[in-house]
């Protein structure tokens, strides 16, 4: 399923515009924060596609029925650029497991490149939903 977040007007357009704006993107903290915000928005949209289970919680006024995510979520990212985006996902999927890939482009003299993977840190994905959070 393909879902383009900025196809409809929303605050996402502001985040994308600031990340693309040459004058603004030099502010590394703002750039990282906008990446984190994009991770949050993306996590919210992905949450709509997950499986849910009805549960009951005890409130100060009694019991309330709520639907909660039943999928076990693993959020994976490519180090380093993806870390703020990854954090945005964790802000919403705070009980998710994490996975990391250390990779970079290794360029040859002709300008072509190969992806060099140094390591992957990931537990078992059996029966889990993997979200590859790579901006």
Each language-model region and where it sits:
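PRPP-associated nucleotide enzymes
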Residues: 1-134
